[in-house]
Amino acid sequence: MRSRVILIALILGLSTLPASQAGEPEDLDEVGFVFGGVHIESSMSGNSTSNLSDLPAIVEDYTATWCTNCVKVEHALDDVEETNNMQQYHFHRFIGENEDPLGSQEGDERWIDRYEQRLPPTVVFNGTLRQIGSVPSGDSLQGDYDTNLQNALSLGQGTSTLGWVAATNNSSAIATWNLVFDTSLIPEDATIKSSIWVVEHLAHFPDGGNQEEYYHESVRGIIELGDSMSGSMEVTLPTAYDGDDLEVHLIHE
């Protein structure tokens, strides 16, 4: 009986450890791709549009302010961003979290729904390729990530457009969106859902266990827009952790 208790304790302990082992990039065949990235500062009214062929690769990083292994991963992402068309989104751990103030309930719920495991550090490229941990599969994380980014999406011809009317003292913000996309490129029974990812450009949090202090491109909230290719919606934004540098990003998946 005692050996069984010890085994269970070991399993539970291992399941809660941040992943730092080497991990081969893993194809995610069942969850569908993620694309988009046109964005606007939330305090400014305007619009942004892009051809699908010009959109950046969407790189999702699951992280936490106490995660020391995450620092190596994020520095590697910064390095490869210098030579690749990509946009980073940092999803901070929220559910069951008492040390990291930068995550959101809906961010964690989406991560669980798509990717199941909430193991910082985890990086997902275009929703289709996941690499867990901070030890490289090859010679370096930079080399791994650069290779992962070569698996570009084939989105065909089309455009993604975001319009934004900033909130005033008397009215809520309004988001409009339009996606021109060849739906023959997705399975017959599939749909494309759009959402606004509310991103804090830079947050200062000096109390994180990883000693980073400044955290970039943190996803502070997700606002679902549904599966219509175009529309308009009043939007209430979450509060920035500090400053006034929230951005609204249009994402499709």
Predicted regions and their residues:
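Short, conserved sequence motifs used for protein processing/export or organelle targeting and
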Residues: 100-118, 122-125, 129, 136-253
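Second-shell loop/turn segments in exported
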Residues: 60-66, 131-136
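Extracytoplasmic/secreted envelope proteins and their assembly/folding machinery
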Residues: 59, 73-78, 108, 120
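Structural recognition of the beta-strand scaffold that forms the well-ordered cores
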Residues: 58-61, 87-92, 121-125
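Secretory targeting signatures
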Residues: 1-50, 54-59, 67-68, 76
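C-type cytochrome heme c attachment motif
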Residues: 65-72, 121-122
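Thiol-based oxidoreductase modules, predominantly thioredoxin-like and allied folds used
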Residues: 83-106
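N-terminal carbohydrate-binding/catalytic regions of secreted carbohydrate-active enzymes
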Residues: 64, 77-81, 91, 111-114
